[in-house]
From Swiss-Prot:
Subunit structure: Component of the periplasmic nitrate reductase NapAB complex composed of NapA and NapB.
Species this chain originates from: Shewanella oneidensis (strain ATCC 700550 / JCM 31522 / CIP 106686 / LMG 19005 / NCIMB 14063 / MR-1)
UniProt-recorded name of the protein: Periplasmic nitrate reductase, electron transfer subunit
Induction: By nitrate or fumarate under anaerobic conditions.
GO biological process, alphabetically ordered: anaerobic respiration
Post-translational modification: Binds 2 heme C groups per subunit.
Residue numbers binding heme c 1: H72, C85, C88, H89
Length: 143
């Protein structure tokens, strides 16, 4: 009985696929851009490259208890398995790499094991570069 049902299912599957023909006279699809029919006429020059502070120089903090700013790019990968910041800033590599070691407030033992609450560095620490044009107006005041 199983063989007959299996054979019938195969015949129906093949029969269902074999009688169809591909549509050869398909009409082209006209997709419009979000910009409509307007052409791009204004080509602007590329943005200036950001200038980071000199190596080994700490950036001045704007307010008390502000996390230190990162004086370099901050696109190092941070995943559950690996923290890219620790390739330079871990306690055992910081002196050799001439980098600031992870603060004692961020570790849980004398070996420099990072506390899980401080694992994702870019939650608090941000890269700072001297960009020529501000992206948004800044009304911050230290007073």
């Amino acid at each position: 009985m199983k063989k007959i049902l299996t054979l019938a299912a195969i015949v129906l599957a093949i029969g269902g696929c074999s009688g169809q023909q591909a549509e050869t006279q398909a009409t082209p699809v006209n997709i419009k851009s979000l910009a409509g029919d307007s052409a791009v006429t204004d080509i602007r020059p590329a943005d200036a490259m950001p200038v980071y502070p000199a190596r080994g120089k700490a950036l001045e903090r704007s307010f008390t208890d502000q996390p230190p700013l990162i004086p370099h790019k901050d696109d190092y990968k941070i995943t559950l398995d690996k923290n890219g910041c620790l390739t330079c800033h871990s306690w055992d590599k910081a002196a050799r790499m001439k980098a600031t070691p992870v603060a004692k407030s961020h570790v849980i033992d004398d070996k420099g094991t990072l506390n899980g609450h401080n694992y994702f560095c870019t939650q608090c620490h941000v890269a700072q570069a001297e960009n020529k044009a501000p992206l948004v107006e800044n009304k911050f005041s230290t007073q």
